[in-house]
From Swiss-Prot:
Active-site residue numbers: 260
Protein's UniProt name: Bifunctional protein HldE
Region (Cytidylyltransferase): 332-461
Cross-referenced Pfam families: CTP_transf_like, PfkB
Subunit text: Homodimer.
Record field: catalytic activity: D-glycero-beta-D-manno-heptose 7-phosphate + ATP = D-glycero-beta-D-manno-heptose 1,7-bisphosphate + ADP + H(+); D-glycero-beta-D-manno-heptose 1-phosphate + ATP + H(+) = ADP-D-glycero-beta-D-manno-heptose + diphosphate
GO molecular function terms noted in the UniProt entry: ATP binding; heptose 7-phosphate kinase activity; heptose-1-phosphate adenylyltransferase activity; phosphotransferase activity, alcohol group as acceptor
Gene3D superfamilies xrefs: 3.40.1190.20, HUPs (3.40.50.620)
């Protein structure tokens, strides 16, 4: 279990839910008939709550007021299993409270109660002391800045310096226009509007997006520059090139707290040694879960897995496939199927004609790299699996990580194992577990290698 320290502005989110069907006689404003009320952890506490939902151990550091809202807030943190030992009481301010008024599941108003003054020197020292005490114990840090007075320039830079000194990952969710405040952070997560305001640059093209991210890297020394683009996903730099991770969300009901979900899921993904691209895909999936709910919602690992795996109903794990099959004549074949072409489709159609259920074992990306070198595959396993599953002749697709499909064949025990005719007089792996092995002729003139060579020639001309 990863240990993550979250520091930032703590916000109590309060919701009034109801219906509004008339205007007030006192003024031209809607009247809400309240049907229920709810309270959520907001701001940095919502980041912490998201991390708890993703099975992390969380230490939260910030301030609340000396009031009833502050007491309830700390109680709610403890109830969620969040370590609240870093929460300080500021007698000079109220607990930040945002009240959202929801009618027919639409937000019609918000009322904010807050004090944005910077913390006094004593509180700032106590926060930094807590940070210093915990830094060796934790795996990563998130600075959640809502511009409410906790993370001023000096404190932010001191925490980033300490994190770097101890070789800890530190991510910042920025606010304001001065990004030098976050310089030397591992990663920051501005949205498009925030980054445009900070850099005075319109992000209306790939060129400007790339330029903005280069500025973050070269001017502010952000190790992994990134920008969130709402419905267009997340953009980042990889070896100096702009990469876009498209969004996954199908329906958007409420974007409240989506940024908190993104930074929480990015942090955990990177701490689990995911690549930045994979971490962005994971964060997009987590965001897709929460924007499909009302209020500052949470995404569980199970919900994220469902989103990531909802590529095609025919793409199953071996375990799920074995549960599905029922006394039918099973045909099995396997391959890389990189750059799917007519020859592949013809081969699979002929294989399907031999029985009832055609199962295709698909080499994973890692498997292909071992077999064919680092430049392959051209098409990712997720996309290759989706294309195969889209063929009417294919009933199920199972991705395997090994160099050969022997484990799949042994588990499935197919009626017919289909391989290409080029296996004539060669050993067919797994044939001992099939009732029959059938060698199928390929359609002449079609191969992935030929397509790659044609593309190379075209590019060179």
């Amino acid at each position: 279990m990863k240990k993550i320290l979250v520091i930032g502005d703590l916000i109590a989110d309060y919701y009034l839910w109801g219906k509004s069907e008339r205007l007030s006689p006192e003024a031209p404003v809607p009247v809400l008939e309240v049907q229920r009320e709810s309270k959520n952890l907001g701001g940095a506490a919502n980041v912490a709550n998201n991390l708890i939902s993703l099975k992390a151990k969380v230490f939260l550091c910030g301030v609340v007021g000396d009031d009833l809202e502050g007491e309830h807030f700390i109680s709610a943190l403890k109830a969620r299993g969040i370590d609240a030992s870093g929460i300080l009481i500021d007698k000079t301010r109220c607990t930040t409270l945002k009240t959202r008024i929801i009618a027919q599941n639409q937000q019609i108003a918000r009322v904010d109660k807050e004090i944005k003054d910077p913390l006094n020197a004593d509180l700032r020292k106590k926060l930094l002391d807590f940070f210093t005490e915990k830094i060796q114990e934790i795996d990563g840090v998130i600075l959640s800045d809502y511009n409410k007075g906790v993370l001023d320039f000096e404190l932010t830079q001191a925490m980033i310096a300490l994190a770097n000194q101890h070789h800890k990952l530190i991510l910042c969710d920025p606010k304001g226009k001065d990004y030098s405040k976050y310089s030397h952070a591992s990663l920051i997560t501005p949205n498009r509007t925030e980054l445009e305001h900070a850099l005075h640059l319109k992000l209306d093209s790939h060129a400007n997006l790339s330029k903005a991210l280069q500025i973050l890297k070269e001017t502010y020394h952000i190790a992994m520059p990134l920008v969130t683009l709402s419905e267009q996903g997340i953009a980042f730099l990889e070896k100096g090139e702009l990469v876009n991770c498209p969004t996954i969300a199908k329906e958007v009901y409420d974007v409240t707290g989506a940024g908190d979900t993104v930074i929480a899921s990015l942090t955990l993904s990177l701490l689990e040694s995911m690549s930045l691209k994979d971490a962005c895909e994971f964060a997009n999936a987590a965001a897709a879960v929460v924007v499909g709910k009302m209020g500052s919602a949470l995404a569980s690992l199970e919900e994220i897995a469902l989103i990531l795996n909802q590529t095609h109903p025919k793409i199953l794990s071996l375990e799920k496939l074995l549960e599905t099959l029922d006394q039918q004549k099973i045909i099995f074949t396997n391959g890389c199927f990189d750059l799917l072409h007519k020859g592949h489709a013809s081969y699979l159609q002929k294989a399907k004609a031999l029985g009832d259920i055609l199962i295709v074992g698909l080499n994973s990306d890692a498997s292909i790299k071992r077999l064919k070198g680092d430049k392959r595959p051209i098409v990712s396993e997720k996309d290759r699996a989706f294309l195969l599953a889209s063929l009417s002749c294919v009933d199920y697709v199972v991705v395997f990580e090994e160099d050969t499909p022997i484990k799949l064949i042994q588990a499935l025990k197919p009626d017919i194992l289909v391989k290409g005719a080029d296996y004539l007089n060669k050993e067919v792996i797994g044939s001992e577990f099939a009732k029959e092995t059938h060698l199928m002729e390929f359609e002449e003139g079609y191969s992935t290698s030929a397509i790659i060579e044609k593309i190379k020639r075209t590019c060179n001309d």
